[in-house]
Amino acid sequence: MNIRKIESDKKQFLDLLLLADEQESMIDRYIDRGEMFVLDDNGTKAVAVVTDEGNGCCELKNIAVAPECHRQGYGKALLSFLLSYYKGKFRQIIVGTGETPQHRAFYEHCGFTFSHRIEGFFTRHYD
């Protein structure tokens, strides 16, 4: 298993990114300003994008695992790497996600705590 930072041609991972953020125009808002990491294990298994939101805060904008690789530990491994990588660089890492129970359970299992809900976020920002 290898995790590497992607410096260029980030759109080559668009199909994987679209699994976690279904609207390309939304991905376009953060893909270039964010840092992208890919987890490889005999092929690309997962991808993540993290942005600097200022004031010592970064946001995990997207983390996606190839469907055939779900529940094999790739998402947790990539998230664990990111938490270590950004520790000391930021005082807070936030995640905005949909309200599906499995997504929330994943983040809580990885040490995140629920903060708040933004009412109508998806209806206001997505087509």
Regions found by a protein language model. Give the residues of each.
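Acetyl-CoA-dependent GNAT
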Residues: R4-N62, A66
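A short, internal acetyl-CoA/4′-phosphopantetheine-binding micro-motif in the GNAT/acyltransferase core
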Residues: I63-R71, G98
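Short glycine/proline-centered loop/turn elements that form peptide/ligand docking sites
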Residues: V65, L79, T100-H103, G120-Y126
